[in-house]
Swiss-Prot record:
Free-text function comment from the UniProt entry: GTPase that plays an essential role in the late steps of ribosome biogenesis.
Keyword presence, GTP-binding: yes
Positions bound to GTP 1: 10-17, 57-61, 120-123
Organism domain of life: Bacteria
InterPro entries: G_ENGA, GTP-bd, GTPase_Der, KH_dom-like, KH_dom-like_a/b, P-loop_NTPase, Small_GTP-bd
Segments forming domain KH-like: 353-438
Family: Belongs to the TRAFAC class TrmE-Era-EngA-EngB-Septin-like GTPase superfamily. EngA (Der) GTPase family.
Source organism of this protein record: Crocosphaera subtropica (strain ATCC 51142 / BH68)
Matching HAMAP family: GTPase_Der
Protein's UniProt name: GTPase Der
Binding site for GTP 2: 183-190, 230-234, 295-298
GO process terms (BP): ribosome biogenesis
NCBIfam families (alphabetical): GTPase_EngA, small_GTP
Amino acid sequence: MALPIVAIIGRPNVGKSTLVNRLAKDRQAIVHDQPGITRDRTYRPAFWCDRDFQVVDTGGLVFDDDTEFLPLIREQAMAALTEASAAIFVVDGQLGPTAGDREISDWLRRQKVPVLLAVNKCESPEMGLIQAAEFWELGLGEPYPISGIHGSGTGELLDQLITYLPSPDELPDREEINVSIIGRPNVGKSSLLNAFLGEQRAIVSPISGTTRDAIDTVVERGDNTYRLIDTAGIRRKKNVNYGAEFFSINRAFKAIRRADVVLLVIDAIDGVTDQDIKLADRIIDEGRAAIIVVNKWDAVEKDSYTIYDYKQKVMDRLYFMEWADIIFVSAMSGKRVENIFELVDVAVEEHRRRVNTSVVNEVLEEAVKWHSPPTTKQGKQGRIYYGTQVSSQPPTIALFVNDPKRFNDNYRRYIERQFREQIGFPGTPIRLLWRGKKTRDVEPSLNRATKV
């Protein structure tokens, strides 16, 4: 469902992200005692009474300073307003009206979006009314005293807010496919997001660490709705300092868990690095479908064999993800970017796919016929009784055997390859659970391939 959008606007460090966390009933927006933590516009689902909507956290607005990312942050805030049904202008009740507040309120009065004035940091109900009264001078109507930390006063604010939102009957009902964009810093994740959208939703800069939050953006292609999640670049743990970057990386890992499909973005110039391999490991650990996106392909000198050779190099390093499709794109030019959606659709379908028990056992019967289970040094042979798919997302097949310990890694890889060859499952990992027939104990194994 395409939910109505509410933009959260205000100066740096007035508590916008704290209010977003309060409204969204989570702590996904990064809150840190440092101005400028939020840079891109980030989307969070929220609700009040019987109304669902999205709150959009934006960077702190400063009109009289063009250093660093501030002009780009202004663009993001303006873009958020253009798609919003309403806006909440957050000010600091402890400081009182500032020149920056007056400048933003003058700008907001020229917009065609209804604006509610939230006076934050009013921790005392009695003092809050006095603090809020000072903000009548901004000319934006009634100031609502609130506490983003404790939640006081937000009920009255939200009661008024939902009067500006479209009714649920006016909203299309569609299932969303969650797609997380993951990669090292500066491989082009935000550029890829912007290429999907045809606009600059995420701030793009040659400086590593530009993206801080996991940015949610909803787009539609054909009959499908996709929630694209851009994330902070993930560096080696020893290079990460505690603070905003630490929280950003945690958000990125959570974004992998939220995803139906993960786009693992690799820099075509650098190739597959050790950090890329660790990210691929994380994707498999979480059981997510995945597509390997080789970005900056326009910067590579090519001949008729380049793609084949490069693909082989990628697979040599990411051999345990041989099931994932690889696509070569240029986010800057947009070349082949739209083709990613076709691969996403296939990966999602396979990730959710269920196979009849009869089909599973036909594959097992044929596999055992061609290659019998191994025999131990004591002369005891492994035996597979039957198999059945027990879950999806990722597809998980339980194999009931006489003794899981009698099946070595080579044979387990062989059985997985047979399922891949006979059934498919492109774009998604599969898990095989080897269960003893008597004990029915599940051996904790992801059945990950190892290089032979």
